[in-house]
């Protein structure tokens, strides 16, 4: 969609749509891909970091976690220490992508594997949050956001860049201190309660959206694609799109959700 408008496109993080070549990002609109093809818990390792025996269900279901650069597996993620390098490595790739494309319109997608379990953090953030391992992981993601924004500001791109920070679901409460919390909302991932479905969403776009506001009108993640299409004047794909543009809600021109059900 955006490539047709001359955008350079990159994804650095979790693709989550499979590892076979026909399903990889480079065959679905992205110029560059660096990251893992599915969730970081899809590997033959238990949550405590131990390799499972060959007859374990995880060993039967998954190989070592592959790390891709475009179509090539460049390494395998085998340990929690390996996982702990992902946030920084993907952030550095994202910042480099901005640097190389600062003269072009670009679309950058950074779906970090963390804080999905199993969680891990780089050495530079271990123990820094004083909120345990989960706090350290969130602190490193916060650093990642800052690095990306810093690079945008370095090249005076931040005011004309649509910056979206959000999540896909609530905390996986089964994992206790490794899961986070949705309080004061009820429950978490895998439930229909608000703690599982209602997520933070921060949108920053100085040239198009007035800042400093809290928008109460509900929107959905599937609304982001048509919203981006409207902002960039791009043509939506011909296949059915369930999302609706919420640009008028973001600009304050409308306060009515375009969706009938959530």
Where are these predicted regions, by residue range?
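Formylglycine-dependent sulfatase
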Residues: 1-262
